[in-house]
């Protein structure tokens, strides 16, 4: 890989890391190509970016994006995007694949613990939260109309 290619990769990663809420690092040693494709497809559905990068290039990009502090060793795959989506994709994939291990993440201006990553992965998505809210708002109106219909039937009988 030439120096220009490396600089281009670092620039792209820096831009991606800067514009994301979370950067998650996982070990993927032992995963098949098919499993990695599955991870990428799952991530693409929720607009999470996935890339395998050399640790030295990733360290430079993380430092440029002001998200340094993560210790990068061995084989790493990087996921970045929305906090909850990144955590959900990684946690779900970790459950399905023994070879995939979440190592660390950078979110909210600091290196996150594994317990925080797992907790975020269990939160409902934005769409699910909106659906819950609409259901709560709709319940009183629905109960009111049911009551009116019952009253109407009682009076007509």
Swiss-Prot record:
Keywords: Ribonucleoprotein, Ribosomal protein, RNA-binding, rRNA-binding. It comes from the Bacteria. GO terms for cellular component: large ribosomal subunit. One of its GO terms (molecular function) is large ribosomal subunit rRNA binding. InterPro entries: Ribosomal_uL10, Ribosomal_uL10-like_sf, Ribosomal_uL10_bac, Ribosomal_uL10_bac_type, Ribosomal_uL10_CS_bac. GO terms for biological process: translation. PROSITE patterns: RIBOSOMAL_L10. HAMAP family: Ribosomal_uL10 (MF_00362). NCBIfam families: PRK00099.1-1 (NF000955). Part of the ribosomal stalk of the 50S ribosomal subunit. The N-terminus interacts with L11 and the large rRNA to form the base of the stalk. The C-terminus forms an elongated spine to which L12 dimers bind in a sequential fashion forming a multimeric L10(L12)X complex. Forms part of the ribosomal stalk, playing a central role in the interaction of the ribosome with GTP-bound translation factors. Belongs to the universal ribosomal protein uL10 family. This is Large ribosomal subunit protein uL10. It comes from Campylobacter hominis (strain ATCC BAA-381 / DSM 21671 / CCUG 45161 / LMG 19568 / NCTC 13146 / CH001A).
